[in-house]
Amino acid sequence: MSSDSSRRIQVPEELKEVLLQFSISFLVEQPPDVIDYAVEYFTKLQSERPSVSHTDQSTDDQLSVNSQDADAEPPVMASSRRKSVFAEAYDPEADDDDDGATAVFPKTDEQRARLVESVKNVLLFRSLEKEQMNQVLDAMFERKVQPGDFIIRQGDDGDNFYVIESGVYKVYINDKHINTYNHTGLFGELALLYNMPRAATVQAETSGLLWAMDRQTFRRILLKSAFRKRKMYEELLNSVPMLKALQNYERMNLADALVSKSYDNGERIIKQGDAADGMYFIEEGTVSVRMDQDDAEVEISQLGKGQYFGELALVTHRPRAASVYATGGVVKLAFLDVKAFERLLGPCMDIMKRNIDDYESQLVKIFGSKNNITDTR
């Protein structure tokens, strides 16, 4: 194959995302055998394919074309220059350092807003929660450049990711000019995960300012946060009596499927009459369960940390029969969508069905009848 034809080969965005997500999962789990873990990971991924929406796939196509130029490794380099992609080991369980030890580099509100806007469509940043994003933004450091400065050189090991604050920068591959950044853009994001040679050279055409993030800091923030969250989820799930019917590995799979959500005081979480899309476990705070009665909402119960709601609509396949509101400050919840619910909570189904009788008895005490409601959630 000629060099011209090889340069036309493009790595599909879907493949990039799958490999990146697998890499993150591998780093978090740190299994003893990468092959066995890969088989298990991709088998599970294949079983979940029907639940993947076209919307998620189309979002991947929105990744900035400019941001890929400096990291999209040409095939001609792959066989001779690729190095170990996980050169630095990091064990989040062994990291006892205080999060406050991470350096914080001051930025104006305007600069932070521009950074958020710049990175919001980068795959690695799309999955960050607000707290993680703030930690990443705090840790990004300033680099001033002068005309002629080389920011990255083709073939060098990748270490930093860059967001352009100001300046003009030219991108070269094999000394051929392929792109120009004009006071905006980003490059080098794959360096946050992979220890691989740079696939392009970026040189400053004018003086300018860059914000940079190094791989070790990013991975520490991301992986330590992910590790802590999983541990927290495991502790939360271990405290739920209903889930005692699950095996340990089933609870671990359940923890991996949970998605964090937060609601402010008074904010509605689910609405009576809506279709059920999942259930919730309460991480922090309290919620109020209310039902419409005579043109007014009547509180049925309050739930707190370690309790759950929303499951009975999934069991009965009926619309939500009550509304749930956050009360007493910010409420943090772990959300399990309906597909994962059906896949993971089969062993608990009998327990949840028995709970229906308890809720109906509660309705009789409050309203004098069940009002034909078989699901108060």
From Swiss-Prot:
Q: How is it modified after translation?
A: The pseudophosphorylation site binds to the substrate-binding region of the catalytic chain but is not phosphorylated. The physiological significance of phosphorylations by other kinases is unclear.
Q: What happens when the gene is disrupted?
A: RNAi-mediated knockdown increases ethanol sedation sensitivity when first exposed to ethanol and decreases ethanol tolerance following repeated ethanol exposure.
Where on the tree of life does the source sit, at the highest rank? Answer: Eukaryota
- The segments labelled Disordered in the record are 48-78
Q: In which tissues is it expressed?
A: Detected in follicle cells, germline-derived cells, germline line stem cells and outer rim of ring canals of nurse cells throughout oogenesis (at protein level).
Keyword terms, alphabetized: Biological rhythms, cAMP, cAMP-binding, Cell membrane, Cytoplasm, Membrane, Nucleotide-binding, Phosphoprotein, Repeat
Q: Repeat: is it a keyword of this entry?
A: yes
Phosphotyrosine-modified residues are: Y90
Q: Which residues bind 3',5'-cyclic AMP 2?
A: 242-362
> Could you tell me which InterPro entries the record lists for this protein?
cAMP-dep_PK_reg_su-like (IPR050503), cAMP_dep_PK_reg_su (IPR012198), cNMP-bd_CS (IPR018488), cNMP-bd_dom (IPR000595), cNMP-bd_dom_sf (IPR018490), RmlC-like_jellyroll (IPR014710)
Question: Where does the signal peptide begin and end?
Answer: none
Q: How does it assemble?
A: Tetramer, composed of 2 regulatory (R) and 2 catalytic (C) subunits. In the presence of cAMP it dissociates into 2 active monomeric C subunits and an R dimer. Interacts with Akap200.
- This chain belongs to the protein called cAMP-dependent protein kinase type II regulatory subunit
Source organism: Drosophila melanogaster
Which taxonomic lineage does the organism of this UniProt entry have? Eukaryota, Metazoa, Ecdysozoa, Arthropoda, Hexapoda
